[in-house]
């Protein structure tokens, strides 16, 4: 650095040392006296009084270096004593011992101070130990899980189950379980949270050990520590999987120093003194101005200082920075000196003044220091700033967070610094996403929420379903002032949080600036590259789980990103009227197939990208003018095939595979981890099936474009925004898309990334945060029940009253705490503004799906997460935000609901979508959609053509496809119209709990007559629609009920064994599911018979008789199994096993009764006679099963004991709240009708020889013969067999025809052909 003095004095970095004695004069330097006064004012000695002008030595730039040497001289004792402290053994630079002092698998940072658990319970210690004196070190808690932090000796041996504190000479504090550990464990301290700092103190003079949490002492934890020969203590930690911390042994200033205790690593005292003196000189430069005209010095505020290019000032600063720059490579000095100085500016000045001052200071750093020095200094500065922000305590006014964010903004406003930090630091070295996070306080009293929200309130839910008594209303009136006071406190909190959020949005606006491209790439395009890599690391399933961005950070980052994105989107709209506003935003479909945006290995709707490019290459050419080179396509395919055959060295370099060897591994810190998929993605993209040609004019429809997919790092601004008719990201526009641009292409990519972020982890985190609200509801219910018990408690039972009062106090205190926490959660996660952000994402996804659908087969290129986000964001708005804010108040809510309904109705059976998971998600979303009245009405509002197509898909045969959800949807459309089918929860179960009221299955019946009519019309239309659908329903009913009976037989056998045994809960769940399926299939049959009875009863149809016989057979089977007293079903129901709560007589019997009533009571007499004859002809029919429905006892068999008189019998008459009098009258009419008809049938029946009975069913006489094999059966059996199989039941020969057969006569005319 000393060689930089040559050259012109005022050139770039040429005036570092400008004594230049060989030159006769220096132009521009002030006269000697003023220069002497100025330099003495700047470089005054801090230890002595200011000498008089006559006694002090004259100063000029020739003797200034000598003066500086004297000024910066410190006591030699300070430097010599560095690292030579009694009571400490080991290196002076204290780090974690990743070579030998560990147990288990751990990930260690590059600086050897941060550690992440990667095994069950890993342990690591430091390289330095202490045996005498008072020592302290700090641990920055990054995650609040299971950890034991403290001290151990070198002889302690740990394993995957035992860590620090589990051996005799190791001591630990565990804030997760709020305990201290030394072989045994006792309660100690407070619970810690992510963002806290634990100070570990050891006093080896007194033999005590204690801890502090965020600077507050938790008291002495252990006494009488073992001391003496061979007893030295190492800092140590044991942590479970995915937990992470960072240590500060003294390499940085302690956040909470403790008087009398020394950090394990000594601070650089001598360099610190020098740096502080140089900083004082620098401050003096900023507060003094030269007035050459008057020949005097002018004092002024440092915030008003401007660099005006005066040679004297520049040379002075050059001398300061010549000494200051080498010191700023030390982390300790950057944080203790430079950071403190900059924070002081931010705290004292207005935001505008602070930004101007910081901007000038950064200008000076870049001017007087080498680039590598500035870059290293900025890197350390931002890392320190992020640590300060992340680990600062929450105070009522959030003042600390505001100061740190204001300084961050001031630094990022400096263009050169911003671009360097974006390119090399913000996403590569540190988790910059932390800057957008507002941590939730675990201890509300420390965050000052008690003062901010002095009055607490929580909703009092009535225990009565949907009914509020006068007492409840009076209580609500009494609570109203309290609720309003609570809401005012919440608003005060929200306003303070909004200040922090606004600063965070400012940071992102700076990072998304695209007008700072002078002298290099604009910030926005650097951000896009880093943002895409960040998404890739978090999207990859093979990434390192502990290194992924925590979901709570993602939530905050997403909301700030949406705010900044919409700001720039609408700003572009203001200057370009033809563009779209952010309310009309969507992602054009060509982004998904032109290869300009990397979607890594994420699944597309149509499957793998390589497969789609092969199968849809003709559609790409015809619709998007994109040609795929077959040779490159083949290369891509081979590259995918060879992916698993990587060379051994390459595979060994993968981080995940390297971890398998065990031990503590140095962990690189680019972002969260260099994703293992990055190499594959880039290799795929570089050999992708498209090559680039930039046309200079608009393309005609006959021209085809060959495009080449570029990796993220290779793209330029032109590749994104486009130029000279090259549309950039929008290359390959389909004819359905408008020509005018929506907005800047770079903003489209940011929007695409925001949608991907929501899918990665934001939705799951939104669901987790609802837990606080659930806790409030549970405690509120418990408090209400306790207060009721206190009111009912007899006065003489003072002991019970005391216990109840104690419980009441505990619940009240817990609710006070939770209600304040809930206010914080509502302000940071579930506010109205956050709800609008998620709603905006939902509408963006809907428009994107609609535009993609118009491209026909190219819709298959869309990533699956667009449909997932559309489904999940609506679910979040309804279930997570809905209890706090009404969805109906959202702008355009009804229209959005209808558009989502149209997408679900169209795409749940879309053949272009092949992924099983996404198809299941669509089906489940539609099933949930039809459960709620407002969303069901939205389905009814979609165009009739789409409604009919949806119902047609629902009526497709159930074979060879997932049919349970389809059947559930049909059942929901019928619920409320069926026989005794108006219940929300089964009659034998308890009433609905308030917290369960939002579940789809517990919604009140809301049938859709419109969709029922569509179903009836479709079943009447084609000759094959109804038979194929009903045949599949009957097959599934036969399977489901048979499986159910088989399972309850096993359960009954297990229950009757004398030895102790347990029934597998999974078996019980499957059993209950089969029962529910049987009931729902019966309900679908009831709906079909009610809507279109002629399918079964009009025997002019070729399949009606066969369907009716099969239906009668199944109904009799169900009735016989369920209605027989003291049989298998009856015994299992009386067991009331957990898991079989839904198994009961009522749901299945009323479903069967509904079908029988429709067949035998409603309709003309000719139809009822046909149904009656078929039902009675079935050999399984028993009249007692029908009598059972009305509670009539079964007549005892001869010699059998009479039934117990007090035995409770099932009867539909007992369910007056669920079955109307009219329905009961119909059952009685049906019973009378069947009693009469069965008596007549018994009198008219003739005995049949066994040889004449059908050899398949042994119930009906032989009436058909198969050709050509000649085997015989009844017509019902062969018709049913031919519905599913064309081979002979007996010999497996192919049946050509079936002919009528009568005993003693030859075959007659052919009745049907196979």
UniProtKB/Swiss-Prot annotation:
Zn(2+) 2 binds at residues 1269, 1271, 1288, 1291. Its EC number is 2.3.2.27. One of its GO terms (molecular function) is ubiquitin protein ligase activity. InterPro entries: B30.2/SPRY (IPR001870), B30.2/SPRY_sf (IPR043136), ConA-like_dom_sf (IPR013320), RNF123/RSPRY1-like (IPR045129), SPRY_dom (IPR003877), SPRY_RNF123 (IPR035773), Znf_RING (IPR001841), Znf_RING/FYVE/PHD (IPR013083). Its main location: cytoplasm. GO terms for biological process: protein maturation; protein ubiquitination; proteolysis involved in protein catabolic process. The keyword Transmembrane helix does not apply. The modification Asymmetric dimethylarginine is found at residue 683. A zinc finger (RING-type) spans 1254-1292. It is found in: Cytoplasm. It is an enzyme of class 2 (transferase). One of its GO terms (cellular component) is cytoplasm. Coiled coil: none annotated. The modification N-acetylalanine is found at residue 2. This is E3 ubiquitin-protein ligase RNF123. It comes from Oryctolagus cuniculus (Rabbit). The gene is RNF123.
């Amino acid at each position: 650095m000393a060689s930089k003095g040559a050259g012109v004095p005022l050139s770039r970095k040429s005036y570092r040392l400008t004594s230049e004695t060989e030159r006769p004069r220096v132009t521009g330097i002030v006269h000697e006296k003023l220069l002497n006064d100025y330099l003495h004012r700047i470089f005054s000695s801090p230890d002595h009084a200011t000498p008089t002008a006559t006694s002090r030595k004259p100063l000029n730039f020739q003797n200034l270096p000598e003066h500086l040497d004297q000024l910066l001289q410190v006591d030699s004792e300070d430097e010599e004593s560095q690292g030579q402290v009694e009571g400490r053994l080991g290196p002076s630079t204290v780090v974690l011992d990743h070579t030998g002092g560990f147990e288990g698998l751990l990930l260690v940072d590059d600086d050897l101070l941060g550690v992440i658990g990667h095994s069950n319970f890993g342990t690591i210690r430091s390289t330095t130990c202490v045996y005498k004196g008072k020592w302290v070190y700090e641990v920055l808690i990054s995650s609040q899980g299971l950890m034991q932090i403290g001290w151990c000796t070198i002889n302690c041996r740990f394993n995957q189950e035992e860590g620090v504190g589990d051996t005799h000479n190791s001591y630990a504090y565990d804030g997760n379980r709020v305990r201290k550990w030394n072989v045994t464990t006792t309660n100690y301290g407070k619970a810690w949270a992510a963002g806290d700092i634990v100070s570990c103190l050891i006093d080896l003079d007194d033999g005590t050990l204690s801890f502090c949490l965020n600077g507050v002492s938790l008291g002495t934890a252990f006494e009488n520590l073992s001391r003496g020969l061979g007893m030295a203590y190492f800092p140590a930690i044991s942590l479970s999987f995915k937990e992470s911390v960072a240590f500060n042994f003294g390499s940085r200033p302690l956040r909470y120093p403790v008087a009398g205790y020394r950090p394990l690593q000594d601070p650089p005292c001598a360099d610190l003194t020098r740096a502080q003196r140089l900083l004082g000189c620098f401050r003096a430069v900023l507060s003094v101005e030269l007035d050459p005209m008057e020949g005097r010095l002018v004092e002024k505020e440092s915030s008003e200082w401007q660099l005006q290019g005066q040679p004297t000032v520049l040379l002075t600063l050059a001398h300061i920075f010549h000494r200051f720059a080498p010191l700023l490579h030390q982390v300790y000095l950057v944080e203790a000196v430079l950071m403190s100085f900059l924070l002081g500016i931010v705290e004292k000045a207005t935001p505008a003044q602070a930004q101007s001052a910081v901007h000038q200071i950064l200008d000076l750093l870049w001017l007087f220091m080498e680039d590598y020095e500035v870059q290293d200094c900025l890197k350390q500065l931002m890392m320190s700033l992020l640590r300060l922000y992340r680990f600062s305590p929450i105070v009522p006014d959030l003042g600390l967070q505001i100061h740190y964010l204001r300084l961050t903004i001031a630094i990022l406003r400096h263009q050169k610094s911003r671009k360097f930090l974006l390119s090399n630091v913000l996403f590569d070295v540190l988790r910059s996403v932390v800057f957008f996070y507002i941590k939730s306080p675990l201890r509300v009293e420390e965050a000052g929420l008690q003062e901010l929200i002095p009055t607490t309130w929580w909703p009092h839910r009535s225990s009565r379903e949907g009914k509020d008594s006068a007492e409840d209303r009076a209580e609500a009136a009494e609570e109203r002032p309290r609720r309003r006071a609570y809401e005012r406190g919440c608003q005060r909190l929200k306003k303070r949080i909004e200040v922090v959020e606004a600063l965070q949005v400012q940071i992102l606006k700076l990072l998304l600036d695209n007008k700072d491209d002078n002298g290099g790439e604009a910030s926005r395009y650097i951000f896009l590259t880093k943002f895409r890599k960040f998404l890739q690391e978090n999207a990859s399933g093979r990434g390192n789980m502990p290194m992924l961005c925590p979901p709570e950070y993602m939530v905050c980052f997403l909301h700030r990103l949406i705010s900044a994105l919409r700001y720039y989107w609408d700003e572009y709209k203001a200057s370009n009227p033809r563009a779209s506003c952010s309310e009309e935003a969507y992602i054009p479909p060509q982004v998904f197939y032109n290869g300009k945006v990397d979607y890594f290995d994420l699944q597309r709707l149509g499957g793998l990208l390589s497969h789609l490019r092969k199968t849809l290459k003709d559609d790409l050419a015809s619709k998007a003018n994109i040609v795929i080179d077959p040779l490159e396509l083949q290369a891509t395919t081979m590259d995918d095939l060879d992916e698993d055959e990587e060379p051994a060295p390459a595979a060994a370099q993968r981080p995940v595979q390297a971890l398998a060897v065990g031990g503590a591994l140095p962990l690189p810190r680019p972002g969260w981890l260099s994703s293992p998929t990055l190499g594959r993605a880039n290799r795929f993209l570089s050999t992708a099936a498209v090559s680039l040609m930039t046309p200079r004019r608009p393309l005609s429809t006959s021209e085809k474009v060959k495009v080449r997919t570029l990796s993220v790092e290779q793209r330029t601004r032109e590749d994104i925004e486009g130029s000279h008719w090259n549309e950039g990201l929008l290359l390959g526009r389909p004819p359905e898309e408008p020509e005018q641009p929506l907005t800047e292409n770079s903003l489209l990519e940011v929007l695409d990334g925001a949608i991907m972020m929501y899918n990665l982890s934001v939705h799951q985190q939104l669901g987790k945060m609802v837990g606080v609200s659930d806790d409030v509801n549970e405690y509120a219910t418990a408090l209400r029940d306790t207060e009721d018990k206190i009111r009912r408690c007899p006065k003489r039972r003072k002991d019970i009253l005391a216990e109840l009062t104690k419980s009441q106090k505990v619940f009240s205190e817990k609710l006070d705490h939770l209600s304040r926490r809930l206010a914080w959660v509502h302000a940071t996660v579930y506010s109205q503004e956050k709800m609008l952000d998620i709603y905006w994402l939902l509408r963006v996804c809907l428009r994107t799906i609609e535009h993609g659908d118009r491209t026909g087969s190219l819709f298959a290129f869309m990533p699956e997460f667009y449909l997932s986000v559309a489904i999940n964001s609506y679910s979040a708005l309804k279930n997570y935000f809905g209890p706090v804010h009404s969805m109906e108040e959202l702008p355009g809510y009804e229209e959005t609901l209808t558009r989502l309904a149209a997408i679900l109705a169209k795409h749940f059976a879309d053949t272009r979508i092949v992924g099983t998971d996404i198809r299941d998600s669509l089906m489940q979303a539609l099933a949930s959609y039809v459960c709620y009245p407002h969303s069901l009405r939205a389905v009814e509002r979609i165009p009739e053509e789409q409604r009919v197509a949806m119902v047609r898909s629902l009526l497709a045969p159930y074979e060879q496809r997932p049919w349970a959800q389809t059947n559930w949807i049909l059942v929901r459309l019928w619920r409320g119209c069926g026989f005794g089918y108006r219940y929300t929860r089964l009659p034998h179960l308890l009433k609905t709990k308030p917290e369960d009221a939002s579940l789809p299955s517990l919604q009140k019946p809301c049938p859709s007559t419109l969709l029922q009519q569509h179903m009836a019309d479709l079943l009447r239309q084609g000759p094959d629609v109804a038979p194929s659908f009903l045949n599949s329903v009957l097959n599934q009913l036969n399977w489901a009920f048979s499986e159910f009976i088989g399972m309850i037989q096993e359960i009954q056998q297990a229950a009757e064994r004398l030895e102790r045994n347990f029934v597998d809960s999974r078996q019980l769940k499957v059993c209950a599911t089969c029962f529910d399926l049987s009931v729902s299939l019966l309900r679908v049959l009831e709906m079909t018979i009610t809507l279109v009875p002629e399918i079964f009863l009009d025997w002019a149809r070729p399949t009606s008789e066969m369907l009716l016989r099969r239906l009668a057979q199944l109904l009799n089977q169900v009735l016989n199994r369920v209605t027989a007293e003291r049989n298998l079903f009856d015994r299992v129901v009386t067991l009331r096993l957990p898991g079989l709560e839904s198994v009961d007589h009522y749901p299945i019997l009323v479903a069967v009764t509904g079908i029988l009533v429709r067949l035998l009571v409603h309709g003309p007499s000719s139809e009822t006679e046909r149904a009656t004859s078929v039902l009675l002809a079935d050999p399984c029919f028993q009249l007692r099963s029908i009598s059972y429905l009305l509670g009539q006892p079964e007549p005892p068999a001869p010699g059998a004991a009479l039934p117990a008189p007090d035995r409770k019998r099932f009867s539909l008459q007992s369910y007056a709240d669920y079955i109307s009098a009219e329905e009961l009258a119909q059952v009685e009419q049906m019973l009378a009708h069947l009693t009469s008809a069965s008596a007549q049938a018994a009198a008219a029946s003739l005995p049949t020889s066994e040889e004449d009975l059908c050899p398949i069913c042994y119930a009906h006489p032989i009436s058909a013969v198969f050709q050509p094999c000649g085997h015989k059966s009844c017509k019902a059996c062969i018709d049913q067999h031919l519905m599913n199989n064309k081979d002979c039941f007996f010999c497996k020969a192919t049946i050509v025809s079936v002919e009528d057969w009568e005993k003693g006569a030859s075959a007659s005319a052919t009745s049907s052909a196979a």
